[in-house]
Amino acid sequence: MSRDPILSLPWPDARPLPDTFFDRDALLVARELLGKVIRHRQGNLWLAARIIETEAYYLEEKGSHASLGYTEKRKALFLDGGHIYMYYARGGDSLNFSAGGPGNAVLIKSGHPWLDRISDHTALERMQSLNPDSQGRPREIGRLCAGQTLLCKAMGLKVPEWDAQRFDPQRLFVDDVGERPSQVIQAARLGIPKGRDEHLPYRFVDAAFAAFCTRNPLRRGQVAGRDYHLLGHQDPHLQ
């Protein structure tokens, strides 16, 4: 398979992100992935979710898997930008993409179902069947991909199939559909143990979808400038 997905488009106006998009600074990749759409083919259906929440990770900081050292299981983190790194988190699958520089990556923290002529309501129904609620009923759309393991479950993404692989535009890729968040929330990452760089503001959320992410950064009690920062489309992010 060619490394350039543009050479084998699944439909004429698909816009798969090239490897060069990912082979950049992890913070930049994490922010610019907001609004992009993950597409995964199951049979004749293209399941799709808009990326609404991401987290950046670096080799040299203590919150990353890569900081624990190279292993065969973590090898995707040390490959070129644009490799898929999947692992099990809290009993479910979790999706990451390697970024520029060995050990650096972006975690796809949550998404929101995406509907268009390619990924229609039949695809959405498949996603709901893959990720029902605790009673076995279709999960409401806003909560279907509201967390890293929920996202993978709804999208049918599995560690054994995709870990350490490259994107395949005929099966799995990230599509640039032209969506750009008008406002981005930057905050500290979630679930980082104390003493492992838990304070670093490496989490990005599409403000329009804050209510549908893993944990709403705009919930009651959170204070702008202390708990999070609001960034406009052109504003630089915090380092």
Curated annotation (Swiss-Prot):
<comment type="similarity">
    <text>Belongs to the DNA glycosylase MPG family.</text>
</comment>
<protein>
    <recommendedName>
        <fullName>Putative 3-methyladenine DNA glycosylase</fullName>
        <ecNumber>3.2.2.-</ecNumber>
    </recommendedName>
</protein>
<dbReference type="InterPro" id="IPR011034">
    <property type="entry name" value="Formyl_transferase-like_C_sf"/>
</dbReference>
<keyword id="KW-0378">Hydrolase</keyword>
<dbReference type="Pfam" id="PF02245">
    <property type="entry name" value="Pur_DNA_glyco"/>
</dbReference>
<keyword id="KW-0234">DNA repair</keyword>
<dbReference type="GO" id="GO:0003677">
    <property type="term" value="F:DNA binding"/>
</dbReference>
<dbReference type="GO" id="GO:0006284">
    <property type="term" value="P:base-excision repair"/>
</dbReference>
<keyword id="KW-0227">DNA damage</keyword>
<dbReference type="InterPro" id="IPR003180">
    <property type="entry name" value="MPG"/>
</dbReference>
<dbReference type="InterPro" id="IPR036995">
    <property type="entry name" value="MPG_sf"/>
</dbReference>
<dbReference type="GO" id="GO:0003905">
    <property type="term" value="F:alkylbase DNA N-glycosylase activity"/>
</dbReference>
